[in-house]
Amino acid sequence: MHIAPYENLNKPIVDVHNELVPLNYFNIVKLNKGEVFDYSVDGYETCIVPATGKVSVDIEGMNFDQLGNRGTDVWDGEPEGVYAPTGAKVRIVCQSDTTETFIAGAKFDKILEPFDVRNAEIDLVQYGSDETKTHRKIKHILGANQHGKVGRLLVSELFTVGQGGWSGFPSHKHDTDRLPDETRHDETYNFRFKPNYGSGLQMLQREDNKAGDAYHIVDGSTMLIDKGYHPCAVLPGYEMYYFTILGGLSQRSLKQYFQPTHEEQLHTIPGIMDMVAKFK
């Protein structure tokens, strides 16, 4: 499902118990300097990631100050994040002139400890090639390095490095719990383009070798991935970014099932298996 960009007024774009992706939660919070946003999400662990600007985050009296390194857009610096336990009372205060801050969440009933992930701790994976139109960079905020400290939530930022490139290919899905072949992970994306008048295409193919759906995605588009194979592409001449939220049903580690029709392409894309190993 595609949600076109709109002014959400700091209210969740993907709220708890969403009909399509009930394992996910997503909000975009926009604040001016000194403004405050308070929240608590029962039954969901969350992660606060400034897209732009700098904030302080207080979680039940534990303070994480000066979070965020980016100025004008998501290309302007490295990401940082703070993990907030399930149901915790969180206060975000804008410390820069303005901020746009993402709040990602996954359904989880246990209470863990809060922690921050600063830019030096971001786990970077780069794979693909310009020749195969799959050159991609992934910055894991809550990834394999945080395994054991987080319940079900995976948070990352994905950059399509080559202009006119593809992401999420070879096509894969993760909509059914059937280990060891696949896990169920609901997924939510928020897209940005450089320049911001760029756009792209999100495919969603429900069954192998049957026609699926395609969505025109623009700067600020949100996609809910509930079922099926889901590659996406950016127009030539533009770069694409998408903030990625994964919430697992029974485990945190993601097991992707690659589409049989295109599985041989796994052997043509440099470094792709290293990428797969990082979603743990």
Spans of features found by a protein language model:
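A short glycine-rich, His/Asp/Glu-containing loop-to-beta-strand
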Residues: 6-38, 135-188
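Conserved hydrophobic/aromatic beta-strand scaffold that supports enzyme active sites
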Residues: 26-30, 81-83, 103, 155-159, ...
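Extended, compositionally biased flexible segments
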Residues: 27-28, 33-94
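Glycine- and acidic-residue-biased ligand/ion/polar-headgroup-sensing regions
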Residues: 42-66, 163-164, 175-221, 233
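Conserved metal-binding segment of the jelly-roll/cupin
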Residues: 75-95, 106, 216-237
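Short, structured patches in soluble enzyme cores that scaffold and shape functional sites
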Residues: 86, 94, 103-107, 142-145, ...
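Double-stranded beta-helix
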Residues: 98-138, 243-280
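Acidic/histidine-enriched, beta-strand-rich ligand/metal-binding domains
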Residues: 197-280
